[in-house]
Amino acid sequence: MGNLRLESSPETIVGGWGFEEDILTALGEADKLVAAEGNQFWFTGFYDQLPGVDVPDPESLELVRTDDWSLRTEVLYELDPDLFATDPNRFISYYGADGGDISEINDSIGPFFGNASRRKRGDDWPTWPGGESYAYYDIPEFVSRYGALLGKSETAAAINTLYEQALQEMRSRVPPASDRPSVGLLNAQINPDNEGFFRAYNPRTEIDKAYGKKQYRDLGIVDAFEGEYDGQSGIQVDYEALLEVDPDVLVFHFGVNYRDWNGEDALRKTVEGMRDSSLGQELTAVQEDRLYVGGSAYQGPIINLFQTEMLGKQLYPNEFGEWPGEITAGELPEIPEGEQLFDREELAEILTRASEATGSQ
């Protein structure tokens, strides 16, 4: 991420896959976004519950890559953004750029400011520009660093205070391990009908600061497949493997994203296929209707707050209150005010003040 200093506040920004966009939203800077790496993964549905908070339509943002994952360098030059709020090494690892390409973009278009901390980086992860491995950051550290860069340190401090206090309160409600249900964490889009298998994720990560599965870590998920991953982040499983461990609960990771995927509700297809399957109907989670929409892995402070609250209500209703949503409803429910676990009004006030400050710059 480095120690970048800007001569003036950026007017145009390229984002990432939703994480960076959520941080920019928290700091009142989202209206400066002109492009992204993966706009389909920026889930904006939670912002609807924050009065006065507006963000760009993710589909309005240019993509910096082609459908076959090549960098659209000519588009970057046309956009001429003031800042790339993303890790340049993703451009190398994902889109086929090399160090020379990144140096040219950095020098000719705009600087990079980002850090790939969603999950553990692979052994072959690039290390531009210094050639050395670099640190991971947690969500509050990202907020503070972007806040300092964009002249929003006071906003960053307010966001982090609310965020950390709310998470502490939610973590304090988690029941003892003996009272927690076992959980299978499945990809919301991959299923036997389209791939021949389900994909079960390991909810734990080797990096404590990684944000991709943070809510599962914070709420002490009891993993039905613990010990089965052999060092991998996920495994392929069929109905027989699911029935062997028979989780009390099934959570469909990325479910909020896959509800609207290329014009289709991929989550609904996965869930309805399971409910229609004779083997699926033998699963305890299906019989007891404990199938739940899971969150996005691309979560900054705002999205993570909502997703942690959501998961707590899904797994531990006695301690967190009931989750009122039906998984195939097509939209997320609003939690009644008396059952909310963090203050929406306070959060919205911080965000709208930050946006007003941005507009007056």
Language-model regions, residue ranges each:
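Loop/turn elements at helix/coil->beta-strand transitions in domains of secreted/extracellular proteins
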Residues: E11, E29-L33, D80-L83, S108-F113, ...
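Extracytoplasmic substrate-binding proteins
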Residues: N3, G100-G196, G294-A357
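Alpha-helical, coiled-coil/dimerization segments enriched in small aliphatic residues
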Residues: G196-S233
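A short, structured surface patch at a secondary-structure boundary
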Residues: W17-P111, I221-A224, N257-W261
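Sec-exported extracytoplasmic/periplasmic mature domains
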Residues: G18-F19, T25-E29, E78-P81, N89-R90, ...
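Acidic/histidine-enriched, beta-strand-rich ligand/metal-binding domains
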Residues: P56-L61, E226-V237, A241, V245, ...
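Extracytoplasmic low-complexity, Pro/Thr/Ser/Ala/Gly-rich segments
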Residues: M1-D22
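A local structural motif
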Residues: N3, E7-P10, G52-V64, S153, ...
